[in-house]
């Protein structure tokens, strides 16, 4: 959400309150969770694209604590306080390879759930979580090929649409689908 003012200046705090009331009213009316990325107030029409991009970027913060109104001030606070611990992709790959070769669906699910629990608890944004998964998937393919799966031909499909997969659970579903496909290919092709 953006606001272009023509004649009188509106303080950012007032704008944030208006948006919070509007979103709160919509949420209670429709009975659903709606999130609003709110840009700073601006006076120059030439800033419209920049402010829309700012509001869109802030929407990715909704996964952190379920806040409905995501303001630039909130985004700055989060980014200044947040320290992302590194995810140990190497250990995860070892565990996943073992579970995939054993065709242990429950263990694969447990590992993926643990990875996403780590992302949630560490306040990873969804694009950051996906980047870690892309790295992990590349290491996983490499490790499977070294283990004799030279015919493995499964590529990561690219980052899912953030408008559809806009939660940890959504991304976790995509990752579990990838793991199921790898498990199926291992079962089907065996080791060379």
Residue map of PLM features:
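Cytosolic nucleotide-utilizing catalytic cores of signal-transduction proteins
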Residues: 1-192
């Amino acid at each position: 959400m953006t606001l272009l003012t023509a004649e009188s200046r509106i303080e950012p705090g007032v704008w944030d309150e208006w948006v919070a009331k509007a979103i709160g009213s919509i949420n209670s009316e429709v009975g659903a969770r709606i999130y609003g990325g709110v840009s700073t107030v601006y006076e120059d029409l030439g800033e419209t694209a920049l402010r829309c991009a700012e509001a869109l970027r802030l929407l990715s913060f909704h996964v952190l604590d379920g806040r409905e109104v995501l303001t630039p001030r909130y985004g700055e606070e989060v980014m200044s306080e947040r320290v992302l611990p590194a995810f140990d992709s190497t250990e995860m790959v070892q565990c996943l390879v073992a579970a995939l070769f054993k065709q242990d669906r429950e263990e694969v699910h447990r590992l993926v759930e643990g990875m996403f629990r780590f992302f949630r608890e560490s306040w990873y944004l969804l694009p950051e979580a996906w980047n870690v998964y892309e790295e992990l998937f590349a290491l996983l393919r490499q490790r499977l090929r070294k283990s004799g799966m030279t015919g493995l031909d499964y590529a990561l499909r690219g980052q899912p649409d953030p408008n559809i997969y806009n939660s940890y659970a959504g991304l976790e579903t995509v990752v579990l689908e990838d793991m199921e496909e790898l498990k199926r290919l291992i079962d089907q092709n065996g080791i060379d």
